[in-house]
């Protein structure tokens, strides 16, 4: 069965093209770009000892953050679900697409979205139990991609699934690391931005956005009349509030996907899709009405008929419907 809901804004851009644009702009501004240069944390006090500022944007496995856990007061929480980042030339051009498939071992699902004219990202996620049962741990990267292609064949229109993780040893599948830092600044001259400072689960698609907004905020404060130490503190104070808000939403969405088998088995299609659309709690019932009033009205009508049996009557908001606890109906 297919359900569609509109009104949800989305922008996709290929990572390669994105980096090309950033490189071109940096050169335009006179920045010296160095590639294939190994970096060690000790370089901060040796090679870069005369630098006024070192910006550590070295990602979720940040060497800088990991070298000073007591300074950055960082925690990394490894979540249980397994996922693998794949690509395909099936474009999914009309919408951000979620696909749920039940295998002999249990449920597995995909997050798919287009990022250029002929390519889409295709993230496959599942529970650790299904991951183990399907034998992904013992597969090569290519075998994993082919197994996923077979599972989702009905949605790929003959296209293959591509892997870009040859640099990863062992399984291409990973667990999501939820990174939190209480402090982003060291010695008033080293600062974390992006995934080095915080991560947000891929299901809300805000990781790159957060990193860019960090950079914009940092540049704004450095370009002000503030000293570098004061500018770094202003940047951290400003960004931590917004990052925490999005991390909370991402955490809600992440935990929802960790319980997909429970929801998909217990809910009917409309109720399951409503639960998925509101999973982050950024999208409330009434916010969903603003985004897609037709879909929400159909869902309210569906629940009204299911719980009250008044086919054709005006839909009742879900909060006013009766609730059944085992065999005991609770009249609202």
Question: What are these model-derived regions, one by one?
Answer:
Residues 24, 48-176, 180, 185:
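Conserved FAD-binding catalytic core of PHBH/FMO-like flavoproteins
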Residues 220-332:
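C-terminal helical "tail/cap" subdomain of flavin- and related membrane-associated enzymes
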Residues 5-7, 132-136, 203-205:
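Short acidic, glycine/proline-rich loop/turn micro-motifs
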Residues 2-3, 128-131, 197-199:
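A short, flexible beta-alpha/helix-coil linker loop
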Residues 1-85, 296-299, 304-315, 319-328:
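Conserved N-terminal helical subregion
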Residues 55-56, 86, 172-252, 256-258:
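Conserved mid-domain beta->alpha element of the FAD-binding
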Residues 16, 138-142, 205-213:
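Short, conserved loop/turn and helix-capping segments at secondary-structure boundaries
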Residues 21, 38, 63, 147, ...:
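Alpha-helical elements of Rossmann-like donor-binding domains used by nucleotide-donor carbohydrate transfer enzymes
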């Amino acid at each position: 069965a297919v359900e569609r809901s509109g009104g949800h804004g989305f922008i996709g851009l290929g990572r390669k093209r994105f980096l090309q644009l950033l490189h071109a702009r940096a050169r335009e501004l006179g920045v010296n770009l160095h590639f294939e240069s190994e970096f060690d944390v000790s370089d901060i006090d040796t090679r870069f000892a005369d630098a006024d500022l070192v910006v550590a944007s070295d990602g979720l496995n940040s060497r800088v953050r990991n070298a000073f856990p007591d300074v950055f007061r960082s925690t990394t929480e490894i979540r249980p679900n397994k996922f693998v980042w794949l690509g395909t030339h099936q474009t999914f051009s009309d919408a951000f697409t979620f696909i749920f498939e039940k295998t002999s071992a249990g449920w597995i699902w995909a997050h798919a979205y287009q990022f250029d004219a002929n390519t889409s990202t295709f993230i496959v996620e599942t529970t650790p139990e299904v991951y183990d049962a399907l034998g992904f741990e013992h597969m090569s990267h290519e075998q994993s991609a082919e197994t996923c292609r077979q599972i989702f064949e009905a949605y790929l229109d003959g296209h293959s699934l591509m892997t870009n993780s040859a640099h990863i040893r062992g399984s291409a599948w990973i667990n999501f690391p939820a990174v939190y830092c209480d402090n982003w600044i060291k010695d008033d001259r080293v600062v974390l931005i992006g995934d080095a400072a915080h991560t947000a689960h891929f299901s809300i698609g805000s990781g790159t956005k957060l990193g860019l907004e960090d950079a914009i905020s940092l540049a704004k404060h450095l370009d002000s009349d503030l000293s570098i130490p004061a500018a770094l503190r202003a940047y951290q104070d400003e960004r931590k509030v917004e990052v925490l808000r999005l991390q909370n939403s991402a955490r809600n969405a992440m935990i929802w996907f960790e319980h997909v088998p429970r929801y998909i088995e217990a809910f009917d299609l409309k109720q399951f899709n409503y639960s998925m659309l509101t999973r982050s709690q950024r999208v409330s019932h009434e916010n969903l009405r603003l985004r897609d009033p037709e879909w929400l009205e159909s869902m309210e009508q569906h629940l009204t008929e299911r719980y009250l049996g008044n086919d054709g009557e005006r839909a009742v908001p879900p909060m006013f419907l009766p609730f059944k606890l085992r065999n005991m109906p609770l009249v609202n």
